[in-house]
Amino acid sequence: MKNQSKTSSISQNTNVLEALNDVLKLRRERFWTITLMLIVIFATTLYGTLRNPFINTFSKIGNYFGYRVLYIIWAITVSICIHISSILLFKLTDYSKKMGSLGLLFASFFLIVTAIIPSIKEQLPFWHILHKWTTFFYVMSMITALHPFFVWLGRKIPRLKVLLRNWQLFILIGSITSLLIQGQTGIFELWFFWGLGTLMIYLFWILFTEKIEEAEQHEHIAEKEKNRS
């Protein structure tokens, strides 16, 4: 009987520790995903406003004004932050489609390559055209990675369906409006990353918070069972 009681006590202590570790892990992941996306917004705003974004694209800022190194650093930073935070969101929501992870990988690759390729139309026309294509493939990769996920998430959590649809439309309409009014400028790029960043931060906060609350309930239950014994 003593051995059984001791075994039961060890098991209950283990359950409490596991529940506590789950809570701490989720809190850490919530902190880092939000921090990473804030870095995306901050870095994008900082780089995109080095020159007038109503006139200059990110590419032009990097290639025509001597900010090529900063352009590459921005692309690497943004790629890593979006990739890591999105993968953590996929894991949190049990999104298992490989196309999402593959799309993020390609998006990171194409954004970094886009920044590395020189884009000076007058002097390097071939590289300028290649730069345009890698930009296009970056956008397509991001759409492939995230749009199906948002649709899937809206079906899994119906209360988010309208918000996800409207937020994506907000980003799309804002981007198209920017292109029609300003042409291809930095405002288009700023709008995209601002819109995506704020959407992701919102999702990180509400989804991680819900998981944390569930884990805390499990922790309280495990603690009560331990105290009863």
Question: Where is each model-derived feature located?
Answer:
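N-terminal topogenic module of multi-pass integral membrane proteins
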Residues: 2-93
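Membrane-interface helix-boundary motifs at transmembrane edges
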Residues: 21-26, 87-101, 151-163, 211-216
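Alpha-helical transmembrane segments of multi-pass integral membrane proteins
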Residues: 30-49, 70-81, 102-118, 137-145, ...
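Transmembrane helix-loop junctions and nearby membrane-interface residues
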Residues: 45-52, 83-93, 112-122, 143-153, ...
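Non-cytosolic membrane-interface motifs at loop->transmembrane helix junctions
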Residues: 63, 123-136, 186-196
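Membrane-proximal helix-loop-helix units in multi-pass membrane proteins
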Residues: 107-163
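Terminal transmembrane helical module of multi-pass membrane proteins
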Residues: 151-229
